[in-house]
Amino acid sequence: MLVILAFIIVFHIVSTALLFISTIDNAWWVGDGFSADIWRVCTNSTNCTEINDLSSTEEFSGYSVMQAVQATMILSTILSCISFLIFLLQLFRLKQGERFVLTAIIQLMSCLCVMIGASVYTDRRQDLHHQNSQLYYLLQEGSYGYSFILAWVAFAFTFISGLMYMILRKRK
């Protein structure tokens, strides 16, 4: 039982770490000498433009889309942290034989938020780049970066983690 418990804890910590990295790091769209994410666009290592600074509609078209991605990724990270804390509390407070349902529900909500954020970015990325060509002029020839991929991996991890919590019962 201790091995299963250790595995679940490590799995949850890894999925939360993936959420933090994918939300914070600047590599959702990368290419030769540039990178862009949900927070900023960098044409080289020293020339970065914060998207939040360009929030007026005439400067950055589609800002609400980026805000939606930012909000869902932040919310998924927060929910994953909360579900881990609730899991630790339930570990000591639940009666023997009960399931970790609250932890599972919150972890699955985190999974849903990651899916929404990554899906919105996937769907709207090309439109954002074309509508804001003055900012993304170098970024047309690029590919999805490791932060974007980590967001999808975190989606899978949080989904599996949520299912594990749903199935798991407290034992001695």
Swiss-Prot record:
GO terms for biological process: actin filament organization; actin-mediated cell contraction; apoptotic process; bleb assembly; blood vessel endothelial cell migration; cell adhesion; cell-matrix adhesion; early endosome to late endosome transport. Interacts with PTK2; regulates PTK2 activation and localization. Interacts with ITGB3; regulates the levels of the heterodimer ITGA5-ITGB3 integrin surface expression. Interacts with P2RX7 (via C-terminus). Interacts with ITGB1; the interaction may be direct or indirect and ITGB1 has a heterodimer form. It is found in: Golgi apparatus membrane; Cell membrane; Apical cell membrane; Membrane raft. GO terms for cellular component: apical part of cell; apical plasma membrane; cell surface; cytoplasm; cytoplasmic vesicle; Golgi apparatus; Golgi membrane; membrane raft. This is Epithelial membrane protein 2. PROSITE patterns: PMP22_1, PMP22_2. One of its GO terms (molecular function) is integrin binding. Belongs to the PMP-22/EMP/MP20 family. It comes from Rattus norvegicus (Rat). Pfam families: PMP22_Claudin. It is a multi-pass membrane protein. Keywords: Cell membrane, Cytoplasm, Golgi apparatus, Membrane, Nucleus, Transmembrane, Transmembrane helix. Expressed in glomeruli. The lineage of its organism: Eukaryota, Metazoa, Chordata, Craniata, Vertebrata. Its main location: Golgi.
